[in-house]
UniProtKB/Swiss-Prot annotation:
Single GO BP term: L-tryptophan biosynthetic process
Protein's cellular compartments: Cytoplasm
Name of this protein: 1-(5-phosphoribosyl)-5-[(5-phosphoribosylamino)methylideneamino] imidazole-4-carboxamide isomerase
This protein's GO CC annotations: cytoplasm
Entry keywords, A to Z: Amino-acid biosynthesis, Cytoplasm, Histidine biosynthesis, Isomerase
Family the entry assigns: Belongs to the HisA/HisF family.
Pathway: Amino-acid biosynthesis; L-histidine biosynthesis; L-histidine from 5-phospho-alpha-D-ribose 1-diphosphate: step 4/9
HAMAP family: HisA
Catalytic activity: 1-(5-phospho-beta-D-ribosyl)-5-[(5-phospho-beta-D-ribosylamino)methylideneamino]imidazole-4-carboxamide = 5-[(5-phospho-1-deoxy-D-ribulos-1-ylimino)methylamino]-1-(5-phospho-beta-D-ribosyl)imidazole-4-carboxamide
Organism for this UniProt entry: Brucella anthropi (strain ATCC 49188 / DSM 6882 / CCUG 24695 / JCM 21032 / LMG 3331 / NBRC 15819 / NCTC 12168 / Alc 37) (Ochrobactrum anthropi)
Keyword field contains Protease: no
Active site per database record: D8 (proton acceptor), D129 (proton donor)
Length: 243
C-alpha cells in the first residue's frame, strides 16, 4: 500500500485546489522542487505530480517545475496534466519520469492509451476523474456521459499500470475518501486502483490499512498532508504493516 504525496502545479507553484476550481487555489510552497525533497526526507517512496495549467491547456505548461522536481528527488514520480500524445509521453519518460497519467485522452482516444501501454510497458496509468459517477475531462471542466467502470473496463488487458480514481466532489475539501465507489471500481477491474480525492485524516489511513482496502495499490494525499492532519511517519508505518 503506497501513500502518494501530491504536488499540484499552478503557475510554477505548489498549490491545492478546492473541488478542482482553479480560482480556489491555496499556495503551499513556491518551490515545488524543495517540497518534493521534503516529502522524500519524510520517508515517502513515490510522488504524484499534476500540471494543473497543463490539464486545461492540453500540453505541458509547468515543464520547468516538473524537471526541477525530477532533479530534486530520487523517488519515482508519476505525472498527469496535459499529456495527450505519444510524443508527450516519450518526452517525459526520457527525462526520468517513472509513470505518465493519461486522463482526457483516455476518454477521447482510448486507442492511444492502448498503443502507449505497448510502447512503454508499465509506465502508463489512466486517470479517471469522476463527478456523480460520470467521467470529467479537460481539467474537470467538461462532463462526459461515460461511466467510471465503463471507461476502466476499456483498458482491461491493455497493460495499464494503474488507475488513479478521483472523486471530484471530495477533492481538496477533506471530506473523506468515497469508499463505496473506490472499492467498487477496484472490485470491477483487475487493474490496480489508486484512490484520490478526500483523504482527510488518520482515520482514512487506518481505513486504508483494513483488509478489504488492501486491494488498492494506494492513495494520494494533498491538503491533509499540507495541513498537518496526517502524520507522515505514523501513516507510513501503518500502511507498511498492512502490506
Amino acid at each position: 500500500m503506497i501513500l502518494f504525496p501530491a504536488i499540484d502545479l499552478k503557475d510554477g507553484q505548489c498549490v491545492r485546489l478546492k473541488l478542482g476550481d482553479m480560482d480556489q487555489a491555496t499556495v503551499y510552497n513556491e518551490d515545488p522542487a524543495a517540497q518534493a525533497k521534503a516529502f522524500e526526507d519524510q520517508g515517502f517512496e513515490w510522488l504524484h505530480v499534476v500540471d494543473l495549467n497543463g490539464a486545461f491547456a492540453g500540453e505541458s505548461v509547468n515543464g520547468k517545475a516538473v524537471e526541477a522536481i525530477l532533479k530534486a528527488t530520487k523517488n519515482p514520480v508519476q505525472l498527469g496534466g496535459g499529456i495527450r500524445t505519444l510524443q508527450h509521453i516519450e518526452n517525459w519518460l526520457s527525462k526520468g519520469l517513472r509513470r505518465v497519467i493519461l486522463g482526457t485522452v483516455a476518454v477521447r482516444d482510448p486507442a492511444l492509451v492502448i498503443e502507449a501501454c505497448k510502447a512503454f510497458p508499465g509506465q502508463v496509468a489512466v486517470g479517471i476523474d469522476a463527478k456523480g459517477g460520470y467521467v470529467a475531462v479537460e481539467g474537470w471542466a467538461e462532463a462526459s456521459e461515460l461511466g467510471v467502470i465503463e471507461l476502466a473496463k476499456k483498458f482491461e488487458g491493455a497493460g495499464v499500470a494503474a488507475i488513479i480514481y478521483t472523486d471530484i466532489d471530495r477533492d481538496g475539501v477533506l471530506a473523506g475518501i468515497n469508499w463505496d465507489s473506490t472499492l467498487g471500481l477496484a472490485d470491477s477491474v483487475s487493474i490496480p486502483v489508486i484512490a484520490s480525492g478526500g483523504l482527510a485524516s488518520m482515520d482514512d489511513i487506518k481505513r486504508l490499512a483494513a483488509p478489504d482496502a488492501r486491494k488498492l495499490e494506494g492513495a494520494i494525499s494533498g491538503r491533509a498532508l499540507y495541513d498537518g492532519r496526517i502524520d507522515p511517519a505514523e501513516a507510513l508505518s501503518l500502511l507498511r504493516a498492512a502490506a
